[in-house]
Swiss-Prot record:
GO terms for biological process: response to pheromone triggering conjugation with cellular fusion. It comes from Saccharomyces cerevisiae (strain ATCC 204508 / S288c). Residues 204-224 form a propeptide. Belongs to the SRP1/TIP1 family. One of its GO terms (cellular component) is cell periphery. This is A-factor barrier protein 1. The GPI-anchor is attached to the protein in the endoplasmic reticulum and serves to target the protein to the cell surface. There, the glucosamine-inositol phospholipid moiety is cleaved off and the GPI-modified mannoprotein is covalently attached via its lipidless GPI glycan remnant to the 1,6-beta-glucan of the outer cell wall layer. The gene is AFB1. Keywords: Cell wall, Glycoprotein, GPI-anchor, Lipoprotein, Membrane, Secreted, Signal. Induction: Expression is up-regulated by the MCM1 alpha cell-type-specific transcription factor. Glycans are attached at N148, N181, N191. A lipid is attached at N203 (GPI-anchor amidated asparagine).
Amino acid sequence: MIFAPSFSLIKNILLVSFLISHSFAAKTLTSSSNDDTLARSAAADADMAFFMEFLNDFDTAFPQYTSYMMQNHLTLPQPVADYYYHMVDLASTADLQSDIAQSFPFTQFQTFITAFPWYTSLLNKASATTIYLPQHFITGETEATMTNSSYASQKNSVSNSVPFSTANAGQSMISMANEENSTTALISASNSSSTSRTSQSQNGAHAKSLYFPMALFGIFAVAL
């Protein structure tokens, strides 16, 4: 009986400590989630001009992309391909920047696009200096860059074209399905192993073949 009050007190202290710890952990997780959401939004905001420049370039210079990938054994990251599957299903009025912030594979795309020798040229056309990743904004290392006037001007210019670009990004690529010369060139340039992988890729993408950006489909045929 002498130790009963002490044991009860210790139990209560431990219970209170557990509740405090649990509450703190929940707040930490919520804070971390909010930080990640804000960081992804900031990265999408900063990279939007480059994304638009890339989509336009990829549409018009498709043969150059596929040729370079074949010669250098580059592959299209699956998360990037998955995002384009998703993108072409977006409504023409969709907010592409918001969608990119939610689900775009920033890191995988950076790895892919920086492998091309004309990456710097695309940056210059977009008036950008690099591709920003969400983690850059979590660390705060880009804060000074994001406040300059050239960035603000770039942001306003891009935001006005986003809804239009959302629809055109997919539709312009789909129109490439009619370019038989490009398809023939890709098939003839592939070896027997590539041809086998092409067949597998076509079967896997059959359900969405009418909607998948044909430029990216061509890259799958060559690279996977």
